[in-house]
Every structure is written in structure tokens, then in C-alpha cells.
């Protein structure tokens, strides 16, 4: 009888120890999860507020066209589905590019073209890039986007939250290793400045200042002055160089003749 009681006590102690260890492991996992959420939640929250300020849910079913550098563009969103297109006349050829979800097509004078894998990648990246910048910050909610809160700073007397963005290789496009910073106005929650570095064509660093901000049927569109900085300049140093007039203007990013096709 004593032997049975002793065996029961040993078994109970083992079970209690295992349960305690399991509870401890669960608490550790829970603590790690909360820590991870806290680490990224501020950046996510800032970007979500920026998306709302720039158009919010209106992006989900938006259908707008605009002109950029002489070429007509259009983006049509329908929930998770989308279609991006561009159209330009070159001599006797009308060239139309179209991305429908993950499929790229090029038409010349309404005839579908057979393209190499390299050309498909090049043309689709070019089209995606224009729509990406025209609809900022809408695409910053994509699953391939990795966001991180950097700091709070003041530029020309206005306060900003700075969010850093990188992209996962899967779903991040050809230039997934580019790095971006976005300066989000604390008062308006809109993106007044952005910067990025890139690796292709020997690399480079760019800083953009928004101007001509206008709201068209609830969606914000902006133009940008595009500045160049010395190679390897840290992105977080660019606002100070901008205020000091040490950045070189290289171009203007103009989104013109914006039309809401849903009207």
C-alpha cells in the first residue's frame, strides 16, 4: 500500500513538473509574440493611418487614369484583383501594356506580342513602379512589405514619424533589396517625403519632396521633386542635407491629368 502511495506521489510530481514546464514555455512563447507585435505594431499603425489619410478603403475599388511623362496609365482595383495598364503612341505604333494580377501582356496596334521572359520582367517592373509611386501608400500593406519604425524628427518646423521599408524576396519584385524611408506628417498623416536606395545600374540614393498635393474624389495624388544624394548616403541623413540645400535636384515626378473613371 505504501509502495502504491509512493508511486502515485512520484507520478503526480512528474505530471505537475511537466505541466509547470509547459505553462512556462507557453508564457515564454506568449511573451515573445507580444514583444514581436510591439516591435512592429507602431510602424504598421503609422502606415495604416497614412493609407486612411490618402484614400483608405476607396483604393479597394479605385479606377483612375493619369499621364506620366507622356504616357497614359490606368489602375483598376477590385478587392484582391487588379489591372494596371499603360498606353503610348510611338510613330505608327500604339503600344499597350497590361498587368492583370500576375500576368503581363503587351499589345502593339491591338496585336498581342510574344515576349521573352527578360522583357516581361523589365516591362512589368516598369509599369508596376509607376503605379506603386502614384498610389502611395496603398501598396505598403502588401504581405511582401517589411516595416520598421525608425524615429521621430522635425523637417522645416513640422514633425514626422519615420518608417523604414524593405521587401521580402518572394513577392518583392526584381528590386526587392531596395530600402525605403517614408516621412509621415504627424498632423495630416500623409507622406510628405520619401527616400530610397537602389542597387541596379551601379546603385543610387534618391530623396523626394511632395508638392501639388490634391484630393480627387477622396484619393490623394501628389507630385514630387526628385533629389540625388551621394552614393552610400544613409537615408536617415537625407532630411538634414535637404534642409541645408545639399541635395541635387534631378527631376520632377508629375502625375498629370488625373481622372476618376468611376464617375
Specify the residue positions occupied by each region the protein language model found.
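Sec-dependent signal peptide recognition
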Residues: 2-8
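C-terminal motif of bacterial Sec signal peptides marking the signal peptidase cleavage site
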Residues: 14-17
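Bacterial signal peptide processing site
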Residues: 19-21
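N-terminal mature ectodomain segment of secretory-pathway/periplasmic proteins
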Residues: 31-32, 38-113
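Short, basic/low-complexity N-terminal boundary segments at the transition from targeting/disordered tails
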Residues: 43-51, 126-134, 183-198
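Intrinsically disordered terminal and processing segments
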Residues: 44-45, 53, 57, 89-93, ...
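Flexible, processing/modification-adjacent segments and terminal tails
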Residues: 106-176, 198-201, 259-263
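Gly/Pro-enriched, hydrophobic low-complexity segments
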Residues: 160-260
Amino acid at each position: 500500500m505504501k509502495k502504491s502511495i509512493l508511486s502515485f506521489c512520484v507520478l503526480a510530481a512528474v505530471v505537475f513538473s511537466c505541466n509547470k514546464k509547459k505553462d512556462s514555455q507557453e508564457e515564454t512563447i506568449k511573451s515573445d509574440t507580444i514583444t514581436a507585435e510591439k516591435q512592429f505594431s507602431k510602424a504598421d499603425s503609422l502606415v495604416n493611418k497614412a493609407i486612411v489619410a490618402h484614400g483608405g478603403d476607396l483604393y479597394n475599388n479605385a479606377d483612375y487614369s493619369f499621364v506620366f511623362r507622356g504616357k497614359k496609365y490606368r489602375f483598376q482595383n477590385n478587392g484582391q484583383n487588379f489591372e494596371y495598364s499603360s498606353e503610348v503612341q510611338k510613330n505608327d505604333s500604339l503600344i499597350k501594356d497590361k498587368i492583370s494580377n500576375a500576368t503581363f501582356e503587351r499589345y502593339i496596334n491591338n496585336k498581342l506580342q510574344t515576349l521573352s521572359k527578360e522583357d516581361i520582367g523589365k516591362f512589368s517592373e516598369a509599369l508596376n513602379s509607376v503605379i506603386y509611386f502614384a498610389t502611395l501608400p496603398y501598396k505598403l500593406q502588401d504581405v511582401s512589405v517589411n516595416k520598421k519604425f525608425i524615429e521621430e524628427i522635425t523637417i522645416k518646423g513640422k514633425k514626422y514619424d519615420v518608417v523604414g521599408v524593405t521587401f521580402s524576396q518572394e513577392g518583392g519584385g526584381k528590386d526587392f533589396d531596395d530600402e525605403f524611408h517614408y516621412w509621415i506628417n504627424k498632423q495630416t498623416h500623409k507622406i510628405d517625403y520619401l527616400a530610397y536606395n537602389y542597387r541596379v545600374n551601379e546603385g543610387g540614393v534618391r530623396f523626394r519632396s511632395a508638392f501639388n498635393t490634391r484630393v480627387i474624389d477622396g484619393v490623394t495624388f501628389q507630385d514630387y521633386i526628385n533629389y540625388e544624394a551621394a552614393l552610400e548616403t544613409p537615408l536617415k541623413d537625407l532630411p538634414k542635407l535637404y534642409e541645408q540645400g545639399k541635395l541635387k535636384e534631378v527631376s520632377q515626378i508629375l502625375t498629370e491629368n488625373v481622372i476618376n473613371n468611376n464617375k
